């Protein structure tokens, strides 16, 4: 719960420890995409992964609602955690879901990107603001 998180933050503060929360994106997002399949490239359905690994489901970088959702999450996290940083992951993001998907390909075209690797860079740069 939020109260539990605040207890952990208080415990850390008393010991001069800064907690850096991590919200993974654009990959490692299957749990969120199970709840919000419309933010994926395929529209789901998705199941929460129970095994460690790199999974093919990622947030759709061509869907504006993806950014609205993630910006709201980051805003809430920044209001809870007093530290200056939020880790957004960014590693291990397969780009296969962005290939040949109309929204992702349109974003690539609209932003004058050359391919899906640049779309990932666009995603990270947009979120880091």
Give the positions of each predicted feature.
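Substrate-binding cleft of carbohydrate-active enzyme catalytic domains
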Residues: 1-129
């Amino acid at each position: 719960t939020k109260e539990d998180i605040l207890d952990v933050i208080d415990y850390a503060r008393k010991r001069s420890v800064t907690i850096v929360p991590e919200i993974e994106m654009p990959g490692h997002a299957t749990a969120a995409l199970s709840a919000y399949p419309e933010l994926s490239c395929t529209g789901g359905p998705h199941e929460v992964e129970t095994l460690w690994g790199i999974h093919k489901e990622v947030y759709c970088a061509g869907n504006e609602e993806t950014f609205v959702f993630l910006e709201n999450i980051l805003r809430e996290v920044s209001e809870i955690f007093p530290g200056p940083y939020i880790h957004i992951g960014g590693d291990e993001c397969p780009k296969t879901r962005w290939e040949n998907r109309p929204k992702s390909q349109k974003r690539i075209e609209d932003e004058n990107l050359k391919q899906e690797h640049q779309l990932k860079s666009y995603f990270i740069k947009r979120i880091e603001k």
